[in-house]
């Protein structure tokens, strides 16, 4: 299993929007960055990810599961762009803010800190466990 981070602006698509889609999930569409697209191509059904609110809140607020592998993005006719589908698993007990992540030296190399603008990012297993611990949330 691999771990990921999905960033979204709360005003565009927030955690509560994701939860309303249930186990069927929703396309993580609209990504127009080649590196982020390639990360989605690497994802497998069952992989887990952090749901991160960017902009105002800047915090990990939930855990999602990849429920459909990479496929053409339905928001464009351009075949270069693909997306995965994700479904909500559970909210974080305590949101983990970007400040908390940056303050933890163990997370200094995390993509969220190094490549903060990338909308889809890999997360190592160690980073996954640390962030879940900071949020008092079960990593499984």
Residue ranges with predicted function:
Residues 1-44, 138-140:
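Compositionally biased, charged N-terminal/linker segments
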Residues 17, 95-101, 131-134:
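Short, charged, solvent-exposed linker or helix-capping segments at domain edges/interfaces
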Residues 11-13, 93, 130:
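Short, acidic Gly/Pro/Ser/Thr-rich loop/turn segments
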């Amino acid at each position: 299993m691999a771990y990921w981070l999905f960033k979204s602006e709360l005003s565009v698509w927030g955690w509560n929007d994701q939860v309303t889609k249930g186990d069927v999930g929703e396309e993580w569409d609209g990504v127009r960055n080649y590196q982020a697209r390639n990360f989605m191509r690497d994802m497998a059904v069952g992989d887990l990810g952090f749901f991160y609110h960017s902009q105002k809140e800047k915090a990990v607020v939930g855990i999602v599961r990849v429920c459909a592998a990479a496929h053409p993005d339905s928001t464009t006719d351009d075949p270069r762009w693909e997306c995965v589908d994700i479904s909500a698993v559970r909210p974080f007990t305590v949101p983990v803010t970007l400040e908390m992540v940056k303050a933890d030296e163990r997370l200094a190399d995390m993509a969220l800190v190094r490549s903060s603008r990338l909308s889809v990012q890999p997360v190592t297993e160690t980073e996954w466990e640390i962030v879940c611990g900071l949020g008092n949330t079960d990593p499984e």
